[in-house]
Amino acid sequence: MISKEQKQKIITEFGKNPNDTGSVEVQIALITDRIRYLTEHLKSNKKDHSSKRGLLKLVGQRRSLLRYYQKKNLEAYRTLIAKLGLRK
């Protein structure tokens, strides 16, 4: 799971201030980090179906947030996906 320090690092990197946990950029970055963690977990635990279901829910949540952010601010969306290393 994501540690407190790692979470705070992501918040300071993507947020507007250190207490900015609700902005779209921070939410997408945190979900992306959790998705990366779960994909590594599922590589070694192939039969963990509940984690796989949770991963699919996170991917759907991130997709909807990305769609919203793309409509809201296209340039910031492009820089965000480049920063996170997402394909598109």
UniProtKB/Swiss-Prot annotation:
Name by which UniProt lists this protein: Small ribosomal subunit protein uS15
Top-level lineage group: Bacteria
A Pfam match: Ribosomal_S15
SMART domains: Ribosomal_S15 (SM01387)
GO terms, biological process: translation
SUPFAM superfamilies, alphabetized: S15/NS1 RNA-binding domain
One cellular-component annotation, GO: cytosolic small ribosomal subunit
Coiled-coil intervals, chain numbering: none
Functional note: One of the primary rRNA binding proteins, it binds directly to 16S rRNA where it helps nucleate assembly of the platform of the 30S subunit by binding and bridging several RNA helices of the 16S rRNA. Forms an intersubunit bridge (bridge B4) with the 23S rRNA of the 50S subunit in the ribosome.
An example Gene Ontology molecular-function term: rRNA binding
Subunit organization: Part of the 30S ribosomal subunit. Forms a bridge to the 50S subunit in the 70S ribosome, contacting the 23S rRNA.
Keyword Transmembrane helix tagged: no
Source organism (scientific name): Borrelia hermsii (strain HS1 / DAH)
Keywords: Ribonucleoprotein, Ribosomal protein, RNA-binding, rRNA-binding
Family classification: Belongs to the universal ribosomal protein uS15 family.
Residue ranges crossing the lipid bilayer per the database entry: none
